[in-house]
Curated annotation (Swiss-Prot):
Protein name: Subtilase-type proteinase RRT12
Family affiliation: Belongs to the peptidase S8 family.
Taxonomic classification: Eukaryota, Fungi, Dikarya, Ascomycota, Saccharomycotina
Gene behind this protein: RRT12
Entry annotated with the keyword Cytoplasm: no
Signal peptide residue numbers: 1-17
Amino acid sequence: MKPQCILISLLVNLAYAEEYLVRFKNPTAFQQFTSNSNRSWRQFIDNKIEKKFSIGSFRGVTMNLSKNLVNKLKKSPLVADIVPNFRFEAFEGDSVNSAESSYTFNATAKYSYEDVEEEQNITYQPDAPRHLARISRHYQLPFDVGDKDRYKSWFNYYYEHDYQGQDVNAYIMDTGIFADHPEFEDRVIQGIDLTKEGFGDQNGHGTHVAGLVGSKTYGAAKRVNLVEVKVLGKDGSGEASNVLSGLEFIVEHCTKVSRPQGKKCVANLSLGSFRSPIINMAVEGAIEEGIVFVAAAGNFNLDAYWASPASAENVITVGAFDDHIDTIAKFSNWGPCVNIFAPGVEIESLSHLNYNDTLILSGTSMSTPIVTGVAAILLSKGIEPEMIAQEIEYLSTRNVFHRRTLFFKPSTPNQILYNGVDKLDDPYDDETFPRLNIEAIAKELEEYNATLQTPMSENLQSGSKLWGWNNDVTLPLGEIRLKRRDFMKNL
């Protein structure tokens, strides 16, 4: 369609415009779209484009468009996708104590310990959090169902002293970070705030996540730098355009600031939406720039194919397992998109409210930063960014989950995170392990339902389908309860 014809349609429909994300097929298509020789076209486009995005080979814009114009533009050979500027959410899983509260507080936090040196550059953190102890051993940790605190102070976290992520910048794309917390030891860098709330964390999710990446007590990488990329507000959500702007910032900061300072780059994405080609392609564009991206699989007990950015190519996608019973968490997404599972049930980390309390949360949002911390360690050891996913899988502990529990999770990898420390597992006297009813666990995993809010529910009528989602099935939109088999029918 000629630009002049599209321009007429634009003018007719201005009063009915709303904001859309537009992805172009390639950089050349973007250039042709924005620099057409027709003066009226260029002037109109310049006025309507709110933001331009350039992330690797990804090119996109946000534009105020009417629905009629969307139908016109989608026929353009230059345009790949058009979607409303939908909402992104911080992934949260089941709360620990109730279905109403996402947070459990622990007022007995302690931030003083001394690492103990062992042989061959191996250091251990005594009285370590359970999630850290689990990733530095191959076999199950003891757990007493009748006395959950019985083994609380028994565990050590082993790691290599010289490789703690000290030459790595970890970008935390989330709700912000409580940067003044002493656990971060002045290693937080204010990157960008896209929420207009200002830097800092008014939600808690981002601080908890950052603590699992690199805090002194709860972090896998004890000396990594943490870059605050605030794309989600105090309610834990934000626009997809914020996520795109955050990705663009990460690429620019990594290439122009981090690398000239000798720093390597890894990004943590403990957030997500329903499957979106625009988000996936933007993340893939950022990965082209040599940045490691680690993403949460999601908490809907579905194939992670249906979540973004979990389904993006070359992202390290993380599922959650329960390290109390060494079984995939009932809420965790699964499937061939998942690279690795990490502890994600009742995970303790920092609070955004004060220095003394900690938070206990569950979800793939908690599993993901633990993997991000290990990725930072591997980058410190000289592993190339494009090899990090392969190295994490190579080091993993395999065949931990009972095969019966994977029966309804086809092509799901049976491997959990291991940090690669070269030592034998600690023995424990008077060990107690839960006696598991595998049939009951398998049944619960199969039948567990999660409430899924699709990102387009505010923009689309029930049962409609958004143009550009060529691989998606038509679903009733809004708040719906979905089982794995509902999706498998359409695969």
